[in-house]
Amino acid sequence: MAEISAKLVKELRDQTGAGMMDCKKALNETSGDLTKATEWLRQKGIASAEKKAGRTAAEGAVGSYIHTGARVGVLVEVNCETDFVARGDAFQELVRNVAMQIAACPNVEFVTTDDIPADVKERETNIEMGRDDLGNKPEAMKAKIVEGRVNKRLKELALLEQPFIKDSSLSVAEMVKQLAGKIGENIQVRRFTRYTLGEGIEVKQEDFAAEVAAMTA
């Protein structure tokens, strides 16, 4: 495979408005062919989605999902630019898919890694720095290992970084970008809440043997 230069990635980005990583992936998939890479991005719905990302998305919908057995429930707000799109089947399906994704991902706490507070990042870094397997590593190597582990952990906490449950070849972010490209509007997952039945409730543990003994004494 031909090496993809930074200059070629920048050229594709300038032409399409897609993100750097998306451009690099497109060029890798097409062996560095700029025209084919542009077509690849358009097919994925990415080429035009990035240019729309800066536009205001004030319409949208609050979606809900209750998992089978009513033990997990989700509320999620997804925004778009117009009420017309918000009422459309494609957008409504996306909102439901995002809600289902949240229900399926109990570890997810934030929409993106940028939303993760500094104290959470610091906590995760301290945890990784204290791992026993790093004790004899050189400081430079240790820092690199910790950075990689922390980044991996932060991605586990971010909704948009998760593999899409209906197509694991896509992340949730890529799935959203695809629809944004197809409908021609900026789409943003703004916030969500996940409820688990009984979460946070301390359940009293009964000593049934002692209870029976007391009743028969």
UniProtKB/Swiss-Prot annotation:
Report the GO molecular function annotations. Answer: translation elongation factor activity
Q: Is Cytoplasm found in the keyword set?
A: yes
Work out whether the entry's keyword set contains Cytoplasm: yes
**CDD domains annotated for this entry?**
UBA_EF-Ts
Predominant location category: cytoplasm
**Highest taxon of source:** Bacteria
Q: Which Pfam families match?
A: EF_TS (PF00889)
Q: Where is this region: Involved in Mg(2+) ion dislocation from EF-Tu?
A: 82-85
Q: Give the UniProt keywords, A-Z.
A: Cytoplasm, Elongation factor, Protein biosynthesis
Q: Where in the cell is it found?
A: Cytoplasm
Which PROSITE patterns does the record cross-reference, listed alphabetically? EF_TS_1, EF_TS_2
* Cellular component GO terms held in the UniProt record: cytoplasm
Q: Function of this protein? A: Associates with the EF-Tu.GDP complex and induces the exchange of GDP to GTP. It remains bound to the aminoacyl-tRNA.EF-Tu.GTP complex up to the GTP hydrolysis stage on the ribosome.
Q: Which family does it belong to?
A: Belongs to the EF-Ts family.
HAMAP family with a match to the protein in the record: EF_Ts (MF_00050)
The protein in question is named Elongation factor Ts
Q: Which organism is it from?
A: Synechococcus sp. (strain RCC307)
